[in-house]
C-alpha cells in the first residue's frame, strides 16, 4: 500500500485552504490510470503530474532536486531505498510514523513523520509551503544522516556476511538448518580462501 489516495486527499485539503503546489507522481503500475482519474475527480488535474516510470537516472535526479519534499506514505515497502535516494539529493521525505520506510528517521530533523491519514498529509504539505528554510535544513540533515553510498552499502553487506560466516565456522548458530544451507557453506569456504590469500 503506497498511500497514494491519502496523498491525493491531503493535497485536496491543502488546495482548499489556498496553498499552491505541484505534485509529481513518478512511477507506473496497474493503479496509475485510476489514480489519475481520482486526482481529476478531486479537482487536482492542474496540480498533479503523472509522467509514469522514469528509467533515466539523471532525469529522476533532476526531479528529486527540483522538489521541496518527497511524499512517500507507504506502509508496504520494507526498505525505502527511495528515501535514501531522495536524501542523496538533499530532499527530506514525508513518511508514515512506525513504517519500515521511516526507520532511522527523526521528525523535523531529517524527515516529516505523519499519521496514516489525509489530515496529517495536508499538514505536511502546509508545512512544506510555509517553512521553506526548515524544509531545506531537513534536506541537508537527510543528506548527512540518511544517505548511504553504494560503496558503504556493499561494505556493510560484506561485514554482515563475515559475521554469518564466522558463526557458521564456530558452530555458534541458533538456526542450524539455515547455516547448513550449501550457500552459507560455500561463502564460508570462499572467506577461508580469501583469508589464506591475504595471510601470504
Predicted regions and their residues:
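Aromatic "clamp/platform" in nucleotide-sugar-dependent glycosyltransferases that forms part
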Residues: 75
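C-terminal amphipathic helix plus adjacent low-complexity
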Residues: 153-200
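Short alpha-helical donor nucleotide-sugar binding micro-motif in glycosyltransferases
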Residues: 53, 61-67
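Nucleotide-activated donor-binding/catalytic signature segment of Leloir-type glycosyltransferases, i.e.
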Residues: 36-54
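A conserved mid-protein helix/loop that constitutes part of the nucleotide-sugar donor-binding site
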Residues: 1-13, 19, 23, 30-36
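Short hydrophobic beta-strand element within catalytic cores of glycosyltransferases
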Residues: 92-96
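Conserved acidic donor-binding segment of nucleotide-sugar-dependent glycosyltransferases
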Residues: 107-108, 112-118, 127-132
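A short, well-ordered alpha-helix in the C-terminal region of glycosyltransferases
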Residues: 134-148
Amino acid at each position: 500500500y503506497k498511500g497514494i489516495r491519502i496523498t491525493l486527499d491531503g493535497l485536496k485539503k491543502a488546495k482548499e485552504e489556498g496553498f499552491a503546489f505541484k505534485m509529481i507522481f513518478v512511477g507506473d503500475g496497474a493503479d496509475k490510470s485510476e489514480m489519475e482519474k481520482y486526482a481529476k475527480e478531486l479537482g487536482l488535474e492542474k496540480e498533479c503530474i503523472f509522467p509514469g516510470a522514469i528509467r533515466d537516472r539523471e532525469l529522476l535526479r533532476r526531479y528529486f532536486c527540483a522538489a521541496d519534499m518527497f511524499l512517500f506514505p507507504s506502509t508496504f515497502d520494507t526498505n525505502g531505498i527511495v528515501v535514501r535516494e531522495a536524501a542523496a539529493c538533499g530532499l527530506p521525505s514525508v513518511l508514515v510514523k512506525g513504517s519500515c520506510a521511516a526507520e532511522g528517521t527523526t521528525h523535523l530533523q531529517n524527515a516529516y513523520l505523519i499519521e496514516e491519514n489525509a489530515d496529517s498529509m495536508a499538514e505536511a504539505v502546509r508545512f512544506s509551503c510555509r517553512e521553506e528554510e526548515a524544509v531545506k535544513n531537513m534536506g541537508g540533515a537527510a543528506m548527512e544522516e540518511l544517505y548511504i553510498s553504494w560503496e558503504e552499502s556493499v561494505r556493510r553487506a560484506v561485514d554482515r556476511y563475515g559475521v554469518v560466516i564466522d558463526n557458521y565456522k564456530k558452530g555458534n548458530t541458533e538456526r542450524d538448518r539455515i547455516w547448513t544451507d550449501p550457500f552459507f557453506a560455500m561463502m564460508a569456504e570462499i572467506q577461508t580462501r580469501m583469508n589464506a590469500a591475504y595471510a601470504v
